[in-house]
Each structure stands twice: as C-alpha cells, then as structure tokens.
Amino acid sequence: RVREIKKLVNAGKYFMINRARQYGKTTTLRALYRNMMKDYYVVSLDFQTFGSAEFETESRFANSFADSILEEFERRHREFPKKMEESLENLRRKISERPLNENFTLRSLFGYLGDLCASADKPIVIMIDEVDSASNNQVFLDFLAQLRAQYIDRDIQPAFQSVILAGVYDVKNLKRKLRPEEEHKYNSPWNIAAEFTVDMSFSKEEIAGMLEEYEADYHTGMNINDMAQWLYNYTSGYPFLVSRLCQLMDERI
C-alpha cells in the first residue's frame, strides 16, 4: 500500500486520501513518512492542531502555516545546504516580525515556499492530515488555490514534489457542505488532484498475515484461513473493525 502511494509521489502527483474515520489514514501517512525520508524532505502537518483563530484571516493562516513548516524542518531535519538554510532563515525572519504582519498574504507565503523548494537539495513533500478541520473556511480554499497555481506553474517555477491531503471528505466536494449563498466562492481549487485509487482496506491475505503472527505467539490452534475469511466477510476489510474484533476475541473469548 505504501509502495503504491509512493509511486504517486515519485510521479509528482498532488492528491487526496479521503476515507471514513479510523480507516488507517494517519497510520498510512506515518508509514509513508518513514519510507520517503531518504529521498525527500517530508513535512507532515495536522490541521487539527490549528485553532479556529488561525483560519480567521489570510495573514494569520500564512504565519501559522509557515511556523509549522519551520518547526517540522527544525525538529526532523537537522542539516541543510547553505542556500536552503538561508531560505529557511528568510521565512523565519518574516514570521518573527512584530506586530503580526497583516500584509503577509498566501501569495507572499508561497513566494517564500517556492524559494525553499528552489534551494533544497532534495524534493519537498507536504502531507496534511485532518484537512476536514479547515474545510469550512474561505482561507483554506484560498490556500488550495495557491497550491493549484503552484502545481500548474511548476514547469517554470520551483514547487513541492507532491502534496498529500488526508481527511474524511474529498475537498473537491466542499461545496456540498456550504450554504447556497456562498457557492459563488468555489471553483474546484483542487481539480488538479490525481485520482486516489489505492485500496486502504485489509485483504483476506493481509488479515491472515496478522493472524499468523498472533498464532505464532499464542498457539491457539485456530484455522487461520477460515478465521481470516470470516473476519473479511464480516468487516469488508475495514481496518478499525478488523482490529477491534481481533482485540475483543483476544481479551474476552
């Protein structure tokens, strides 16, 4: 599954992983992060950590997003080429201005991010989890529009290698969640996204593999093939249900 998703990243795709809650999206992103670290600078963000105030104005969001980017680079990536360090320092200096720079727009932010991409010695991949937390905000849609513009112009301007959004809803369908009088605001800012067709559910074989590991430790004598088939039939491979049923059988039966 991670290998399939990485193929999209290697191909430079921007895409959305939208699945029901507890479908393994966050776990998959973490596994993908570990898998890509050697080849890319991977920046992993979570919009659940952004407060509602950070989506109130464009400048607040731009400052918060830039700050999160810098924190990720400082925490997970220790050494950078000189030009890249200069780009990071320029962005750091910009968001350190006090009082808060109300003229720091998304367009300005993406100018700094473009400089960062140009100076990096490895391509940069952005992963953003829980984008549903931001989906009712106009600032978020403006942010998507900037990503779209960056993607379209990347043959002439530096851009992220790949952008991965994760959440319950497909951001292409945000219009459905908004009041009719606001519909004029939306023009499919994420229509550049590649279709995400990777199956996130467990196959019967994957369930059997987990049961084999359990059987090797506990020697229950179960028929692994039959049990895997039963679990798959009952859950359709929904990761949370598979894990929960296995937990209940382990603890209560």
Regions found by a protein language model. Give the residues of each.
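P-loop NTPase nucleotide-binding core
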Residues: K7-Y23, T27-F143, Q161, Y169-V171
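N-terminal pre-P-loop "Q-motif" helix
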Residues: R1-K6
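The catalytic "switch" region of P-loop NTPases
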Residues: P123, S133-A228, N233-Y234, L248-R252
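Non-catalytic alpha-helical coupling and interface elements of nucleotide-dependent molecular machines
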Residues: A66-E74, I152, Q247-E251
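The conserved phosphate-sensing helix
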Residues: T235-Q247
